[in-house]
């Protein structure tokens, strides 16, 4: 293996390492979103179970206000791009559950890509080690 080939392979392995790290970060972010979505579903399900529920409304910077929510109230859902819609409890749950399914698909896809890249990275490292070992044996015999 020439020095140029070794450098090229090393560069490719570094790119794969970066990609694997990026996929790991995406996985972590998606897991966080999944937890938040599950908490939202749980909270929406709990609204109105006992008639009127007391909740904390976030005001920003870790500041909250107590409020009461009745079972008949609409739930406001952010649908992206700064837009929000009002939905009844069942429609809100349906929307949240569909979003969870989308997140699960994205998480599976990201995980599969990370695993494939990690396997390619390990294979590439082993191949590089093997080639470097063969190169050192051939050069030590020429001394």
Swiss-Prot record:
Gene: pfdA
Localization, UniProt: Cytoplasm
Keywords, ordered alphabetically: Chaperone, Cytoplasm
One annotated GO biological process: protein folding
Family under the similarity heading: Belongs to the prefoldin alpha subunit family.
GO molecular function, one term: unfolded protein binding
Stated name of the protein: Prefoldin subunit alpha
Species assigned in the record: Cenarchaeum symbiosum (strain A)
GO CC term, one of those recorded: prefoldin complex
KW GTP-binding (keyword) present: no
Function: Molecular chaperone capable of stabilizing a range of proteins. Seems to fulfill an ATP-independent, HSP70-like function in archaeal de novo protein folding.
Subunit relationships: Heterohexamer of two alpha and four beta subunits.
Top-level taxon of the source organism: Archaea
UniProt lineage: Archaea, Nitrososphaerota, Candidatus Cenarchaeales, Candidatus Cenarchaeaceae, Candidatus Cenarchaeum
Chief place where the protein resides: cytoplasm
């Amino acid at each position: 293996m020439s020095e140029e080939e070794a450098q090229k392979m090393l560069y490719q392995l570094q790119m794969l390492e970066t990609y694997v790290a990026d996929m790991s970060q995406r996985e972590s972010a998606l897991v966080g979103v999944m937890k938040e979505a599950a908490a939202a579903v749980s909270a929406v399900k709990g609204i109105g179970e006992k008639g009127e529920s007391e909740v904390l409304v976030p005001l920003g910077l870790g500041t909250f206000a107590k409020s009461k929510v009745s079972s008949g109230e609409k739930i406001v859902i952010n649908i992206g791009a700064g837009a929000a819609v009002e939905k009844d409890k069942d429609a809100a749950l349906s929307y949240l559950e569909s979003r969870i399914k989308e997140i699960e698909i994205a998480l599976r896809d990201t995980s599969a890509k990370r695993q494939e890249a990690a396997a390619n990275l390990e294979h590439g490292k082993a191949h590089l080690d093997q080639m470097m070992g063969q190169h050192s044996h051939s050069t030590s015999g020429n001394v």
